[in-house]
Regions:
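Non-catalytic, hydrophobic alpha-helical segments
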Residues: 45, 49, 64, 75, ...
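Glycine-rich "substrate-gating" loop/helix at the edge of Rossmann-like oxidoreductase active sites
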Residues: 4-11, 32-42, 66-68
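Amphipathic terminal alpha-helices
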Residues: 129, 137, 141-157
Length: 157
């Protein structure tokens, strides 16, 4: 099984970093980039693991993800919805942001071309194969529901 980014209560990593930026009201300057990323909620992962352990499944490579891929802008909107805040997404033109990243690379700043690429690239996987072998029409938890559950756990810290 090959899960993409797994999240849930106690999560540590890039989702926490984005949550901290958004919760402080810092604007997201990359709103012009409409990337999409797959996520895996811990609830859906547990459902799939239980299915793999209790059903006879042919060995193979199975990608694991929630049913929907979200853009970073949509993810920020989910975070803000949980926090009761208005999303602060700036749509600075892509060309301007690319130039800023190049300058950041020359000056050894945090925003450089490599980091920019990681922030705006797509990473979408299909969970159709794993759902088919387990007889699932859809995952039990939507991407938004799973992320809301995770973000609520950040709020409690």
């Amino acid at each position: 099984m090959r899960p993409c980014m797994i999240h849930g209560p106690g999560n540590k990593g890039n989702l926490n970093l984005l949550y901290n930026v958004v919760s402080k009201g810092i604007p997201w300057p990359l709103g012009a980039f409409e990337n999409h990323r797959s996520f895996t909620s811990i609830q859906n992962l547990c459902t799939v693991i239980e299915g793999l352990l209790t059903q006879k499944v042919v060995s193979g490579i199975y990608h694991m993800a929630d049913d929907e891929a979200l853009s970073t802008n949509e993810l920020i909107e989910v975070i803000c919805e949980v926090l009761g805040k208005k999303a602060n997404i700036w749509c600075i033109p892509k060309g301007v942001m690319n130039v800023m990243a190049k300058i950041g690379g020359w000056l050894h700043l945090p925003l450089n071309p490599n980091r920019m690429q990681k922030l705006v690239e797509n990473y979408v996987v299909s969970n159709a194969k794993i759902k088919k072998v387990l007889g699932l029409q859809k995952m039990p938890v939507s991407a938004k529901e799973g992320l809301t559950y995770t973000i609520l756990s950040f709020k409690k810290r």
